[in-house]
Amino acid sequence: MSRRLYASLAVAAALTCSVYAQQPPAPAPQGGRGAAPCVTRPPVFFSEDWRQTPANDEHPVTQQSIGNASLEIKLYGSTAKEIQLTGTANNENNPTHVWTGLCSTPCALAFRHKTNYADLTGLARIRWNTKTSGFHQIRPIVKLADGTWLVGDRTDGSTRDWLVTEFNVADVRWLKLDIERIVTTGNIVERPDLSKVDEIGFVDLMPGSGHGAGGWSDVAQVDVFAASVPRTASTK
């Protein structure tokens, strides 16, 4: 190839680069039909870290064990009255918590907000601090506005130490829960309507073994992040 042709190609390339450099930058995408929707994470719907007595002793959990005045506590299972409150506030090695060791049958505990349902759709999530013994695990449970109870396939529980875990409710698969017997029924519930949830809590599907190592679940602080749906006068 001749030197004259090389020179011509170099000049052409330089002119092309100059033209592109003078062109204005493409405008940034504007919101509109093709724009991705804005995703908003829900606020704290409720937080509960329990309220211990001045004696700092072990005793059955009651409504007086709830520190959040907006919540009601609900106990389910034939021996749920044996769920104990124990631990000490601000003690990371033994925080104030509920303990299922004295439940001789499966037990469940749920929270009911006095003025609002929870909308557990979208990016709603649950966070809790738990510890277990043996093969015990805790699972989320919900009571829908129509009275249906569901239990999730999500399980938590570290036998080594207290562990804070958080999960998106949208990732959970659900079975119906017979709340009287605390047993699962039927097949996976496809696309349950979680837009209006009456109660939120947890269940240990195994009986407790009593004090000492063996089999039980501890649950300390519980946080739910969800939108609020006001209750009507008839549902408060």
Residue locations for each model-derived region?
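Residue-level detector of alpha-helical transmembrane segments in integral membrane proteins
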Residues: 2, 18-20
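Bacterial N-terminal signal peptides that target proteins for export
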Residues: 1-9
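Bacterial N-terminal signal peptides
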Residues: 8-18
